[in-house]
From Swiss-Prot:
It is a multi-pass membrane protein. Belongs to the MIP/aquaporin (TC 1.A.8) family. A motif (NPA 1) lies at residues 97-99. GO terms for molecular function: identical protein binding; water channel activity. This is Aquaporin-4. It comes from Rattus norvegicus. A motif (NPA 2) lies at residues 213-215. InterPro entries: Aquaporin-like, Aquaporin_transptr, MIP, MIP_CS. The modification Phosphoserine is found at residues 111, 180, 276, 285, 321. Homotetramer. The tetramers can form oligomeric arrays in membranes. The size of the oligomers differs between tissues and is smaller in skeletal muscle than in brain. Interaction between AQP4 oligomeric arrays in close-by cells can contribute to cell-cell adhesion. Part of a complex containing MLC1, TRPV4, HEPACAM and ATP1B1. Signal peptide: none annotated. One of its GO terms (biological process) is response to glucocorticoid.
Length: 323
């Protein structure tokens, strides 16, 4: 295709992958706060996998295995995630779980661009955490290194449903605990999330290993090369997380003010001339405004033809993007 034909095809705005389009989509990537958040997700996942998966090691070895201590494993996973959320929640939001990140994208709390970096960091952290655990564990007791597997008497469909259910209750707890509209939450949000993880393990360890976290399953699977039914630990948790986030955000506790602002935003977007686009932002927190969170408090319109910016601001309460 000639340059002239390409220009006519894409119009004045240029192709969707133009340098300007990419710069706008990933504008928050160039900030220090953004990379601190991504690094926090990486480090939190590394520590979480190292500590929690370490509790699954059977020190009796394959010849004389010890009974599985479900309470020990459940408490270790729950307290580990609570500790990481408490440590890193104010830096990155403390997702520490790709399923939670996807749920945040679907409820417009972060952008797709930011989620890509978060999920990548989470998966890398899980791999390195599992690798360190493998390195420091005697070969005679490594076993499966905590690889999550479906019980032999269950089908893949059963495993998928169990992972969906336990992740649903986890993410619903996250959204409910972090709802800034609530005035009755006085306890520790991190501890509430930790208890939710522990409950999921107490119920589902014997069913599927109780993942609730695709990265937690991904790290040990990479190190051990065991991919049996691995897709379950991505599909189940992500579906459960999206359902929980959507039900809480749009059905049980919808934000009336947010709906009004979005309606105004789309109305203004419809009135813009061809060659303009609109994105929704918020100016609530200086820690967050420099990165890629999708925020509904500000209507930000850039006219590509004129190269100027127009902003229509509206006051809003804080929407917590935590965990």
């Amino acid at each position: 295709m000639s340059d002239g034909a390409a220009a006519r095809r894409w119009g004045k705005c240029g192709p969707p992958c133009s340098r300007e389009s990419i710069m706008v989509a990933f504008k928050g990537v160039w900030t220090q706060a953004f990379w601190k958040a991504v690094t926090a997700e990486f480090l939190a996942m590394l520590i979480f996998v190292l500590l929690s998966v370490g509790s699954t090691i059977n020190w009796g070895g394959s010849e004389n295995p010890l009974p599985v201590d479900m309470v020990l494993i459940s408490l270790c996973f729950g307290l580990s995630i609570a500790t990481m959320v408490q440590c890193f929640g104010h830096i990155s939001g403390g997702h520490i779980n790709p399923a939670v990140t996807v749920a945040m994208v679907c409820t417009r709390k972060i952008s797709i661009a930011k989620s890509v970096f978060y999920i990548t960091a989470q998966c890398l952290g899980a791999i390195i955490g599992a690798g360190i655990l493998y390195l420091v564990t005697p070969p005679s007791v490594v076993g499966g290194l905590g690889v999550t597997t479906v019980h032999g008497n269950l089908t893949a469909g059963h495993g998928l449903l169990v992972e969906l259910i336990i992740t649903f209750q986890l993410v619903f707890t996250i959204f409910a605990s972090c709802d800034s509209k609530r005035t009755d939450v006085t306890g520790s949000v991190a501890l509430a999330i930790g208890f939710s993880v522990a409950i999921g393990h107490l119920f589902a360890i014997n069913y599927t290993g109780a993942s609730m976290n695709p990265a937690r399953s991904f790290g040990p699977a990479v190190i051990m090369g065991n991919w049996e039914n691995h897709w379950i630990y991505w599909v189940g948790p992500i579906i459960g997380a999206v359902l929980a986030g959507a039900l809480y955000e749009y059905v049980f506790c919808p934000d009336v003010e947010l709906k009004r602002r979005l309606k105004e935003a789309f109305s203004k977007a419809a009135q813009q001339t061809k060659g303009s686009y609109m994105e929704v932002e918020d100016n609530r927190s200086q820690v967050e405004t420099e990165d890629l969170i999708l925020k509904p408090g500000v209507v930000h319109v850039i006219d590509i033809d004129r190269g100027d910016e127009k902003k229509g601001k509206d006051s809003s309460g804080e929407v917590l993007s935590s965990v």
